[in-house]
Amino acid sequence: MSMLHQQKRKNHFVFLPLVILLAVCALLFIGLQQDPQKIASALIGKPVPTFSQADLLRTERRVTQQDLPQQTFLLNVWGSWCAYCKKEHPFLMQLAKSMPIVGLNYRDNPQNALAMLNQLGNPFQLVINDSRGELALNLGVDGAPETYLIDQYGVIRYRYSGPLTPEVWQEMFIPEWQKLEAENAKVR
């Protein structure tokens, strides 16, 4: 192989890292343009994935999808380490007076999670301990907080990524709830 040919080959490899870097930057830029609160879950319209996790409040007990409420409820993904989860907590306490909420404690130390609930109150009818993130992974959780609207049949109807506030509740969840109620009225 001639020296000229070897030099040309080396020049191609010099640009390869630059091309790879540009491709990664382009993908990152495209991804950052997406609003994570508006990204629909692939599980919308599908049942909650099968699971068997520890109950955070009664560690000797396992929780499965059969333990979920048999009515429309919220599944809230949270962690004691999550500042936004603490921000939404007062609204969850208020909301829990009118509808069931199941908590999915995500990638958390159980003692820290219990301490947070003892300090701020417990809005959850049931608290699933997902310290390894297994159920969250199957749900497609991006991070905490996330809230899912689940119908009485255990089907995921809506997903919201971010802190649940009265405004989000009114703008995002109430319309979904009303659609669900209209569907239920047709079935009756």
From Swiss-Prot:
<dbReference type="GO" id="GO:0005886">
    <property type="term" value="C:plasma membrane"/>
</dbReference>
<feature type="topological domain" description="Cytoplasmic">
    <location>
        <begin position="1"/>
        <end position="11"/>
    </location>
</feature>
<keyword id="KW-0472">Membrane</keyword>
<dbReference type="GO" id="GO:0030288">
    <property type="term" value="C:outer membrane-bounded periplasmic space"/>
</dbReference>
<dbReference type="GO" id="GO:0017004">
    <property type="term" value="P:cytochrome complex assembly"/>
</dbReference>
<dbReference type="InterPro" id="IPR050553">
    <property type="entry name" value="Thioredoxin_ResA/DsbE_sf"/>
</dbReference>
<dbReference type="InterPro" id="IPR013766">
    <property type="entry name" value="Thioredoxin_domain"/>
</dbReference>
<keyword id="KW-0812">Transmembrane</keyword>
<comment type="similarity">
    <text>Belongs to the thioredoxin family. DsbE subfamily.</text>
</comment>
<feature type="topological domain" description="Periplasmic">
    <location>
        <begin position="33"/>
        <end position="188"/>
    </location>
</feature>
<comment type="function">
    <text>Could be involved in disulfide bond formation. Could catalyzes a late, reductive step in the assembly of periplasmic NrfA c-type cytochrome, probably the reduction of disulfide bonds of the apocytochrome c to allow covalent linkage with the heme. Possible subunit of a heme lyase.</text>
</comment>
<dbReference type="InterPro" id="IPR004799">
    <property type="entry name" value="Periplasmic_diS_OxRdtase_DsbE"/>
</dbReference>
<keyword id="KW-1133">Transmembrane helix</keyword>
<keyword id="KW-0997">Cell inner membrane</keyword>
<dbReference type="Pfam" id="PF08534">
    <property type="entry name" value="Redoxin"/>
</dbReference>
<protein>
    <recommendedName>
        <fullName>Probable thiol:disulfide interchange protein DsbE-2</fullName>
    </recommendedName>
</protein>
<keyword id="KW-1015">Disulfide bond</keyword>
<dbReference type="InterPro" id="IPR017937">
    <property type="entry name" value="Thioredoxin_CS"/>
</dbReference>
<keyword id="KW-0676">Redox-active center</keyword>
<dbReference type="GO" id="GO:0015036">
    <property type="term" value="F:disulfide oxidoreductase activity"/>
</dbReference>
<feature type="disulfide bond" description="Redox-active">
    <location>
        <begin position="82"/>
        <end position="85"/>
    </location>
</feature>
<feature type="domain" description="Thioredoxin">
    <location>
        <begin position="42"/>
        <end position="179"/>
    </location>
</feature>
<dbReference type="InterPro" id="IPR013740">
    <property type="entry name" value="Redoxin"/>
</dbReference>
<feature type="transmembrane region" description="Helical">
    <location>
        <begin position="12"/>
        <end position="32"/>
    </location>
</feature>
<keyword id="KW-1003">Cell membrane</keyword>
<dbReference type="InterPro" id="IPR036249">
    <property type="entry name" value="Thioredoxin-like_sf"/>
</dbReference>
<keyword id="KW-0201">Cytochrome c-type biogenesis</keyword>
